Amino acid sequence: MLGAAAFIIAEFLKISYLDVLLMAVIPTLLYYLTLFLMVEIDVRKFGMKDVVFGQIESAWSLTKKYWFHFLSLVSIIAFMLLGFSPELSVFWATVVALATSFLRRDTTLIPYEIFERRAPLVRGALDSGLLKALQGGSTAVLNVAATCAGAGIIVGVVTLTGLGLKFSSIVLAYAGGSLLLTAIYTALIVWIVGLAVPVTASYIICAVIAAPALIALKVPEFAAHMFIFYYAVLSEVSPPTALSPFAAAAITGGDPYKTTLQCWKYTPPAFLVPFFFVLDPHGSGLLLTGSFKALADADWGSIAVITFIAVVSIMALVTGFQGWMYRNAGPAVRLLLISAGFLLVYPERWSRIAGFCLIAVSMAVQILGRRRALA
């Protein structure tokens, strides 16, 4: 989820890469929970059965064979814990990947035949996995470099002209000082920008022009930046561009537009999660208060409460959008569940009591309807 943007977030906030990873833990789990519930409900609605595939190696068998590939990923975090910069951490992780590739003949980046003198040095080097890896990495970095360079120009113009502050003033004026409206306007801006540019560029641009509006309303800086980054990521699955669903359709051979619509159906509950970050005074608990240092003094009770409310809100929205709880839900029950999901996001006591009451009513209607159907 984070990708290269994690390093940029760390640079903006002047925090460590590990703090960025920490902030992403609960939001990522909530997003996966959304997808799991959506798919599980589809399975129950349409009566899907298990599919038996051909004989393939189990995940455990493959892990036992190729466990060493995980070392390069783990080593990035290990080197950063030792105080290395992100650049050096990635460099030494690459060295670890090269070294561990020699543990098996079929994964080595430099063919054994070269060392055994059974292959010409030059030809063997040209056909080696190392050269192909370097070639692929060099090609892939061009896209990131060009994106960051282009975004850097935009950020420079916005900063030097004061457009960022002016833009924030415009947003605050239109929102009338309302945090809810400011968050909605900011989400729309990030979403629109994200339709045209990649995630990293979208985050960089909006962190300069949109984040100050949220910060001006006393939203913690790290929460404002994660709000923007979250919507920059979600723009990847949003029509009309929807780059990720189009890529998935190309891999599976499915229809791009049908894949996009299905993906769009799965994501609405996830769009509500970032609003917990900025609307609720305890919402930063979903980001584990933004750093390991702050987490050490955190109120775990408030973190547990806000996480529980977020989970219930997601479950209400998922069941409402899918139209299924214990059985097929009618329009009235679906409306109650969706309304409950939205009400739970708003941090007022009355709204959350109302949200839980609507969920209780919906559950009662579903249970009674199921009993009548079985009678």
Where are these regions (language model features)?
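Core transmembrane alpha-helical segments of multi-pass membrane transporters/permeases
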Residues: 120-165, 179, 183-192, 196, ...
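Membrane-interfacial loop-to-helix junctions in multi-pass transporters
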Residues: 64-70, 138-144, 170-187, 215-223, ...
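Hydrophobic alpha-helical transmembrane segments of multi-pass integral membrane proteins
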Residues: 177-210, 228-243
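Re-entrant/interfacial helical elements at transmembrane boundaries that shape
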Residues: 1-13, 25, 200-213, 228-229, ...
